[in-house]
Amino acid sequence: GPSAEEVMEGKEAPQDQGFLEEWLARCQEIIDKYQPDILWFDNGINSRSLDPLKLRLAAYYYNRAAQWDKPVSLSTKHDAYLYGTITDYERQGRAPKDITSHYWQVDEPIGNKFGYIEGLQIQSSSQIISKLVENISRNGNLCLNISPKADGTIPENQQEVLRQIGHWMKINGEAVYGTHAWMVYGEGPT
């Protein structure tokens, strides 16, 4: 079978029909049980050979959303889904450098790792807010990953950064929610 690296990079994926049907059934169960606003797949479904299965999932999800009268989105790494979904870039450095015609997002950890480790170095609220604003100005978004401890608690230093971001959003939310990219990135009044 394929190596883990091949699966993660989308070069190959498990082709066992039983596995694929179970994956689809589990996704459908999550959709029905929780009515998520967004389905986000980190990796593992990038292979073009899985397109028929991914189309079945997308149809199921979007049809359910129509029944709920609710807008929803699909997001995946790379180009696992076709145009119309939200492309996800891991970490800010991989984000588009110019305005795009499609929506996208960056999944960015609050610290230097996605998971919790003792002594985790975290970003300041200013650094995170700058990334958020930068992404919005190019038609993107920021999916901020927090790093809770094994017992589920969020360390105080991360909580403080989240509170600071929340305070900034309370004051400046109008400049974030419902906005869109300008015609030329970096152009316009400051």
PLM regions: where:
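Mature catalytic domains of secreted/periplasmic carbohydrate-active enzymes
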Residues: 1-190
